[in-house]
Amino acid sequence: MSATSNMRVFLPVLLAALLGMEQVHSLMCFSCTDQKNNINCLWPVSCQEKDHYCITLSAAAGFGNVNLGYTLNKGCSPICPSENVNLNLGVASVNSYCCQSSFCNFSAAGLGLRASIPLLGLGLLLSLLALLQLSP
């Protein structure tokens, strides 16, 4: 049997196999737990069939150049916990990001803005002045 004959048999069999295969779609996400930076959160995982979202959750606290803490979590989820939350309290922030395509959670969720030391000092000064004016 010649190579051409083998190809004539092989190609239709391959085509039939490909057309008959059930297409499997598995979401792939990056995953990590309680990490301090995004470089440690680039581990790819294959999500379970029930998972429809890649999620990124981050929380940070600090002011000025003082970092009081930061944590980053990524993974697969059957639900989006909340549609892209960015809660910024000045000295602390919580962020969540959901997406539905493979490896879409590559980036870390935003760190949020942290208050500057002069801004905190001004707020404290104005609060003290207001208290002094209100006292009898």
UniProtKB/Swiss-Prot annotation:
Subcellular location: Cell membrane
GO cellular component: plasma membrane; side of membrane; synapse
Induction of synthesis: By interferon gamma/IFN-gamma on resting T-cells.
Domain annotation UPAR/Ly6: ranges: 27-118
Expression sites by tissue: Ubiquitously expressed in mouse adult tissues with maximal expression in the lung and the salivary gland. Expression is strikingly lower in the fetal tissues except for the placenta. Present in thymus where its expression is observed in immature thymocytes and thymic stromal cells. Also found on functionally active T-cells as well as B-cells and thymic dendritic cells.
Glycosylated residues, chain numbering: N105
Protein topology in the membrane: Lipid-anchor; GPI-anchor
Disruption phenotype: Knockout mice show embryonic lethality at 14.5 dpc. Lethality is due to a critical role in the trophoblast stem cells which form the outer layer of fetal part of the placenta. Alters syncytiotropoblast-I layer I (SynT-I) fusion while SynT-II cell fusion does not seem to be affected, indicating a cell autonomous role in SynT-I fusion. Konckout mice specific to immune cells are highly susceptible to the murine coronavirus, mouse hepatitis virus.
A GO term for molecular function: acetylcholine receptor inhibitor activity
Signal peptide start and end residues: 1-26
Propeptide: 109-136
Principal subcellular localization: membrane
Lipidation (GPI-anchor amidated alanine): A108
Gene3D superfamilies named among the record's database cross-references: CD59
Keywords linked to the UniProt accession: Cell membrane, Disulfide bond, Glycoprotein, GPI-anchor, Lipoprotein, Membrane, Signal
Pfam families according to UniProt: Toxin_TOLIP
InterPro entries: Ly-6/neurotoxin-like_GPI-ap (IPR051110), LY6_UPA_recep-like (IPR016054), Snake_toxin-like_sf (IPR045860), Toxin/TOLIP (IPR035076)
GO BP annotation list: acetylcholine receptor signaling pathway; adrenal gland development; epinephrine secretion; host-mediated suppression of symbiont invasion; in utero embryonic development; norepinephrine metabolic process; organ growth; ventricular cardiac muscle tissue morphogenesis
Disulphide-bonded residues: C29-C54, C32-C41, C47-C76, C80-C98, C99-C104
SMART domains noted in UniProt: LU
Subunit text: Interacts with CHRNA4. Interacts with CD3Z/CD247.
Record function comment: GPI-anchored cell surface protein that regulates T-lymphocytes proliferation, differentiation, and activation. Regulates the T-cell receptor (TCR) signaling by interacting with component CD3Z/CD247 at the plasma membrane, leading to CD3Z/CD247 phosphorylation modulation. Restricts the entry of murine coronavirus, mouse hepatitis virus, by interfering with spike protein-mediated membrane fusion. Also plays an essential role in placenta formation by acting as the main receptor for syncytin-A (SynA).
UniProt name for this protein: Lymphocyte antigen 6E
